[in-house]
Every structure is written in C-alpha cells, then in structure tokens.
C-alpha cells in the first residue's frame, strides 16, 4: 500500500476483535496487526511513502516498509552502473521524479522512468513491466499503458 504523509492518521481506527483489522484505505487488499503499522522515521519529512506487502506467502508474515524516493534513485543508478548502461539521462529524470514524487503522480512518474529505462535498454516501453506490488491504492493499482 502506498501512503502519503497524512494517510497514516486515517489508519488509526478502532481495532476489531481478534487482534487484526482491515486496512482502512481505498483499494486495500491486506490485513495487518497493530504492531505491524509503519511510521516514517521523521514525521516532518513527507517525501517518502509506505509500502505494505500483505499475504506474501504462508511462511512469510506481511510487512511494511518506509521508502524514500531518493534511495530508489540511488538504487536505479547503481543497477545501471553495475550493468554498464549509460545512465546520465535516466539519473537526471529519476532525480526529478524523486524530488516531485507524490502518491497521485506515481503512475505518471513510473511511466516516465519506464520510457527512459527502455530507451536505454533498447526496448520498446511495451516490453518493460512494472514491479509487482501486492497491495496498492486505487491511484497506483493499474499498470500504466504504453506511451
């Protein structure tokens, strides 16, 4: 589940019997225990988002992760450096995306990054796929179409 800085407050609802509650966010697909709720390391820093992976498998408990866009940029840059892909344009584009990232812009941002990555990999955008997210809001649940 992707959350912006203020959505965490909306998740603080009364817990039903049994110790688990349904996530109170549009388009959710997972359950979480109160101990699994994620909070940002610095509540005043709203450029990150929360990711909740529900029902990953019988042997793995659902988990939450707080992600910062700038860290994603560094990971993408390192991936291209490891594979010796030219990445100046991609790094510039993804740095801009990280600086302007919001939940409502996530699909548009992914589409832009996908175009940049695919042109570097000499693929058409239709050949690239979006990473799988097990639980997402209505804003991020649909795969962006080809450009």
Swiss-Prot record:
It comes from the Eukaryota. Residues 14-47 are annotated as: Disordered. This is Putative protein CLUHP3. The gene is CLUHP3.
